[in-house]
UniProtKB/Swiss-Prot annotation:
UniProt region (Complementarity-determining-3), positions on chain: 116-117
Main function: Probable non-functional open reading frame (ORF) of V region of the variable domain of immunoglobulin heavy chains. Non-functional ORF generally cannot participate in the synthesis of a productive immunoglobulin chain due to altered V-(D)-J or switch recombination and/or splicing site (at mRNA level) and/or conserved amino acid change (protein level). Immunoglobulins, also known as antibodies, are membrane-bound or secreted glycoproteins produced by B lymphocytes.
Chain's gene name: IGHV3-16
Residues covered by region (Complementarity-determining-1): 45-52
Name by which UniProt lists this protein: Probable non-functional immunoglobulin heavy variable 3-16
Region called Framework-2, residue ranges: 53-69
Domain of life: Eukaryota
Cleavable signal peptide: 1-19
Source organism: Homo sapiens (Human)
Single GO MF descriptor: antigen binding
Entries under Gene3D superfamilies matching the protein: Immunoglobulins (2.60.40.10)
Region feature (Framework-3): 78-115
Any single Gene Ontology cellular-component annotation: extracellular region
Record localization: Secreted; Cell membrane
Annotated glycan sites: 73
Amino acid sequence: MEFGLSWVFLAGILKGVQCEVQLVESGGGLVQPGGSLRLSCAASGFTFSNSDMNWARKAPGKGLEWVSGVSWNGSRTHYVDSVKRRFIISRDNSRNSLYLQKNRRRAEDMAVYYCVR
């Protein structure tokens, strides 16, 4: 019975607490093949500096594809093969921001890009 009462108490406390994770992307636009574009993502509602972060994309008629990831402190980065040496992921923990620099864009890079925790 004590366990059940603990849950009721916890639910009562959390009912008034509102915590919303927000990831807001910006910087998109149409760019000719060969051009460059920098995407930004402003994060809030969680401890950004403790979280590994990623970019994913959804091209028309295709599934969601992971593009790139960066460790919590920026020391490790990873890329899908198709964007290696063209895209650069980076972060600024002091600004709670994630970035994706897209260089030498190709037609197949046209997609909706998402910032992913």
